[in-house]
Amino acid sequence: MSSSRPANSSSNPGRANQNARVVLTTLDAKIHADFEESGNSFDYSSSVRVTSAVGENSSIQSNKLTTAYLHHIQKGKLIQPVGCLLAVDEKSFKIMAYSENAPEMLTMVSHAVPSVGEHPVLGIGTDVRTIFTAPSAAALQKAVGFTDINLLNPILVHCKTSGKPFYAIAHRVTGSLIIDFEPVKPYEVPMTAAGALQSYKLASKAVNRLQALPGGSMERLCDTMVQEVFELTGYDRVMAYKFHDDDHGEVTAEVTKPGLEPYFGLHYPATDVPQAARFLFLKNKVRMICDCRANSAPVLQDEKLPFELTLCGSTLRAPHSCHLQYMENMNSIASLVMAVVINDSDEVVESSDRNSVKSKKLWGLVVCHNTSPRFVPFPLRYACEFLAQVFAIHVSKELELENQIVEKNILRTQTLLCDLLMRDAPLGIVSQSPNMMDLVKCDGAALLYKNKVYRLGATPSDYQLRDIVSWLTEYHTDSTGLSTDSLYDAGYPGALALGDVVCGMAVVKITSHDMLFWFRSHAAGHIRWGGAKAEPDENHDGRKMHPRSSFKAFLEVVKTRSTTWKEFEMDAIHSLQLILRKALSVEKAVAAQGDEIRSNTDVIHTKLNDLKIEGIQELEAVTSEMVRLIETATVPIFAVDADEIVNGWNTKIAELTGLPVDQAMGKHLLTLVEDSSVGTVVFLLALALQGKEEQGIPFEFKTYGSREDSVPITVVVNACATRGLHDNVVGVCFVAQDVTSQKTIMDKFTRIQGDYKAIVQNPNPLIPPIFGTDEFGWCSEWNQAMTELSGWRREDVMNKMLLGEIFGIQTSCCHLKSKEAFVNLGVVLNNALTGQISEKICFSFFATDGKYVECLLCASKKLHGEGTVTGIFCFLQLASQELQQALHIQRLTEQTAMKRLKTLSYLRRQAKNPLCGINFVREKLEEIGMGEEQTKLFRTSVHCQRHVNKILDDTDLDSIIDGYLDLEMSEFRLHDVYVASRSQVSMRSNGKAIQVVDNFSEEMMSETLYGDSLRLQKVLADFMSVCVNLTPVGGHLGISVTLTEDNLGQSVQLVHLEFRITHTGAGVPEEAVSQMFGSDSETSEEGISLLISRKLVKLMNGDVHYLREAGKSTFIITVELAAASKRES
C-alpha cells in the first residue's frame, strides 16, 4: 500500500521521520535566507506558505543554501553581552579566542580592591590562569583533569584585578576548551561548590510536586509543570509546547501574569522552531536569552588556528536575528527555554556495548517569556534542567498509558471487524450499524462494489469518487491501496474542487474493481485557539513574525490537509481488506467448501485441547516448584486469604517471630503486626487485594514465645496478589527480607554524633553496602561491602562526584542503564539532603565485572553534632539467593501465565474468522437442495459449529461458577441436541471399539423443548467425552434418557429430563470427582471440565451424581426444562 507522503509510511517510521526533517531543514534555510535578504520588508506569512509549497513540489536546488544556513547556525561568532567567553588550549592554558567584552569584564581594575604589581593583559596567547586568583586558577586546572568537565559546572572564580566573582561554565569542543563567564550578581549568594546536588536543592519543591501527581492526565502534568516553573523562575509567561507527529507545535499549558495576551491552544508551523534549533536543544537542554535588544559581542579568534570554533554549546551563544525579531514583535524581551527530551520509540541505535542505546526525541519545550530583560543565574538554570528531566520521565509514562489505550482501541477494532464480517459481506458494512465508519476516526466512508457506490457521511459525489478511482488506476496501478493526509499534495488534480470536506483519504482494493474508502476533512477545522477572541488582523500585521501570524500561517499550510492516518488505524483497514477478500473468494467457491466445515472445527478443537493440556501441565510443574521453594526458603514468606486470615507461614518467619506455624495459621494478620505498622499493612492489603502489587514496603512484626522480649522484627516485603484459576484475586503472598539488624544500624547512625568509621568500615557481613557524600555531592564514604559489590576500591572513588563520575551513563565507574535511572537517583539524593523521608527505591548498576546488580536503595541525611546536614548516607539492600530464585520463579510463572493468556486470546479471535466463513458457507449450502441423509449430517454439523461458537464466547468462567450466567432460551428438538453431542465422541468410541447402547424411545426424543440447547449439548458432550476416555478398549457405554412431565397450571408444563451415562472400567478418579463438586482447590483439566458442566446443569435447576458399582460407573444428570407445545398454547 502506497503513501503519498514519506512521513506517513508505516514500514519504517524512523527513516520516514528523518526524511521529513531533511525537507523541513531545507524550508528553514529558505525562510532564513528570505529574512536576511528582505530585512524590514520580510513577509512572514507568505514566506511560510510559499516555502511549504516549494519545498515539497520543486527539485532540490537549495543544497548550497542549506549548507550555508547550517554553517551559519554552527559557526556563529557572536555572544550575549551579559557575560564573556574564552577559548583555551587545554594543554598550555593559553587563550585561542575571546569575546570582545572579555578584557573589560575580567581585567578591569576595581578601585575597591587593592592590587599589587602589573595588571594582567587579556589577549591571544595569554595564560588564562594569570587572570584569576591563585585558588581560582587551581580550580580551573583541576577541572581540566576531569573526563566529563560538565559535572563540575559552575566553577566559582575571582578576577585577580577586581576581585569580582564569576561562574565559569566550561565545555569541550574539537581543539579547545570553551569557558563562559557569567557574573555573580551582588544580591546573589554565590555557590561555593560545584555539583548537581547544590542546584537540585533549588528545584526540590517543584520535583516533589511532580512526583506526587497521580498518573493518567497529560493535561494535569503540563499544568503543574508550567505553574512550578512560573513560581521557580519568576518569568511573566510560562508555556508548555508540544511537537506533533508532523513537527508542528501547540501550546498545551500556560501561566501568565495578569494583563498578558494568552497563547494557550496556539498551533504554529513546524518552521517556527527550525530543525537546527531542535537539534541544539537535544544537546543543550536549557537556553537563555537575557535581552533581545542588546547588541551582541563578537568573538575574536586566533587567525593562525587551522579550524573554526563552534559556539553551539555555549550558554552565552547569541540568538539569530530572525528569532530576535520574532521576540521583539511579541514583546518578549527575555526568554528561558527547557527541552523535554524522551526516548524515541521509533528509532533504536544498535550498540555493541552491554546496552543498546535508544535515540532521543524532542517531545516539546517549556518556554518562559519576560517583558523586560531578565538574567537567570546558572545554578537556577541547572535546577530547571533537572526539573525538565523529571518532567520528561513523567511525560514518557503518560505516553505509555496513551499507548495502552491505543492497544485497547485495537482490540475494540478487532471485535468490530468480526462483527462486520457476520453481516452480508460486503454490503453489511455500509447498510447496518455499526458500519465501516466506526472502524477508524473519519468524516465519511464509501464502498465501490460491482460498479455501484455506497456512501456514508461526508464524501465526494459519485462522479468525483469515480474520478478518484480513475486517478488511482492511472497513477497507482500496482498498489493495493493508498493513504494520504492531503489529496492535493498527493497529486490528485481534482483535490481543490473537493473543498474542505475531503482532504485526506485512505483507500484499499478488495478486488481489482471493488474498493473501500475513508475520508477526512481538513485539519484546521478541528483546531481551536484558546487565546484572545480578537481576529489576528485587527491587532497585528500578518506579515510580521508573531504568534498570531504563526497561527494564521499554520492554518494556511494545513487547509488542504487532514489529520494523519495512524499506524494502528491502517492496520485495522488492512485487516478488513483481507477479511472481505477472503469472504468474497469463499462465495465463489461454495461447492468446494463442504468438507471444510468439519475439518476446521476439528482443527480448532485440537488446538484448544493441546493448548489447555500444555498450559495446565506447565503451570502444575511451576506450582509444585513454588511450594517446595516456599517451604524450604531461608527468607520469610507468609500469605493471607481474601479475608486477611493467615493461610501460609513458612519456617523462617516462624523462627524470626517465635510464633509456630500451627499457632499463626487462622489468625488475622493485623493481630500479628506492631500497632505502629497497622496502617501500612491495611493499605498494603487493600492494594494487593485489588491486584495492585507493591514492593519494598517495611513494617514490624510482634515477637512471641522465647523471642517475646526481643525487639520487633522489621521486614521489607514484596506483596503479590494470589490469583485463582480464573485470574480472580483470592489472597496475598508476601516475600520478605529481614532487615532488623540493618534498622538497628541505621538507628545507631541517626543517634551517633562522633566517630562512625568503626561501624561503616566494619567488615562484618551484617553490615550492608554503604556509601555516602558530603553536602556538595562528593563521595565521602565507601565501605568494604560496597567494594565487594561494585568491584571499585575505596581509594578509587573517594572525592569523586557521586552523580556523574561514580554513578552515571557514560564514562562513570558504575554504569547506569538509562538517563531515567540517573535522574531518579538525583531525586532520591536531593530528597535526603533536604531532610525529606525517602522510601526505598529499586536501584541497579553494572559492576566492574559486567554483572548487573539489582538492589534497594535507602538514602538518609548525615547530621553534624549541632544538627546541621553534612551529607548523605546510602544503604543498599540486596535480595538473598533464595529470594532472588523465588522472585525469578514468580516472574517465570507470570510470564508463562501471560503467554498462555495471550495465546488463548489470539486463538479465540482467530477462530472466529474461519467460523464466520463456515457460517457463510452454511447459509449458501442451505440454498442448495440436499438429500435426507445429507440434510441430517448438515444439521449435526451446524449444531457442532454453534457449539464451538458458544465455547469461544463463554470466557467468563467466574460467572458460570458463581451462577450468574444468563441462559439463552430457545426452542429445540431433544433429538438434535443428543445427536450433536453423540457425534463429538463417535470417532474416539469407534477407535477404541467401544459398544455404545442407546436406551430411549424415538417418540420421546422427538419432543420439542424450551431451554438453552447449546449449553445442554455442551454438558452432554463433556460427560460423554469423559466416559469414553475412561472406558477401556472393547468396553461398554450405555446412554439412557427418561422424560417426565409436570403441569404447572394451564400455561406452563415442566419437563424433567434424566440422562444416565454408564461406562465400564475403573471410573473417574476421586480427585476429579472432588473437583467437580468444588471440594478440592486443585483443578486438573478433567476436573475443570466436570466442574463447569455441573455448574451449567445447576443453572438448569438440575444436578449431577456419580455412582460407582462393581466394574462400572454412572453419571446421573438431571435438568428441568419447559415443553414448547404448552408454552405456545
Curated annotation (Swiss-Prot):
PROSITE patterns recorded: HIS_KIN, PAS, PHYTOCHROME_1, PHYTOCHROME_2
Domain PAS, chain residue ranges per copy: 622-692, 755-826
UniProt cross-references to Pfam families, sorted A to Z: GAF, HATPase_c, PAS, PAS_2, PHY
Species, as recorded: Petroselinum crispum (Parsley)
MF-aspect GO terms: photoreceptor activity; protein homodimerization activity
Keywords in alphabetical order: Chromophore, Photoreceptor protein, Receptor, Repeat, Sensory transduction, Transcription, Transcription regulation
Posttranslational modification: Contains one covalently linked phytochromobilin chromophore.
Protein name: Phytochrome A
Domain named GAF: residues: 217-399
InterPro entries assigned to the protein according to its UniProt record, in alphabetical order: GAF, GAF-like_dom_sf, HATPase_C_sf, His_kinase_dom, PAS, PAS-like_dom_sf, PAS_2, PAS_fold
Record: residues binding phytochromobilin: 322
Gene3D superfamilies noted in UniProt: 3.30.450.270, 3.30.450.40, Histidine kinase-like ATPase, C-terminal domain (3.30.565.10), PAS domain (3.30.450.20)
Keyword set includes Plastid: no
Family named by the database record: Belongs to the phytochrome family.
Top-level lineage group: Eukaryota
Assembly: Homodimer.
Functional summary from the UniProt entry: Regulatory photoreceptor which exists in two forms that are reversibly interconvertible by light: the Pr form that absorbs maximally in the red region of the spectrum and the Pfr form that absorbs maximally in the far-red region. Photoconversion of Pr to Pfr induces an array of morphogenic responses, whereas reconversion of Pfr to Pr cancels the induction of those responses. Pfr controls the expression of a number of nuclear genes including those encoding the small subunit of ribulose-bisphosphate carboxylase, chlorophyll A/B binding protein, protochlorophyllide reductase, rRNA, etc.
Entries under CDD domains matching the protein: HATPase_Phy-like, PAS
Domain called Histidine kinase: residue spans: 906-1123
Gene Ontology terms describing biological process: detection of visible light; red, far-red light phototransduction; regulation of DNA-templated transcription
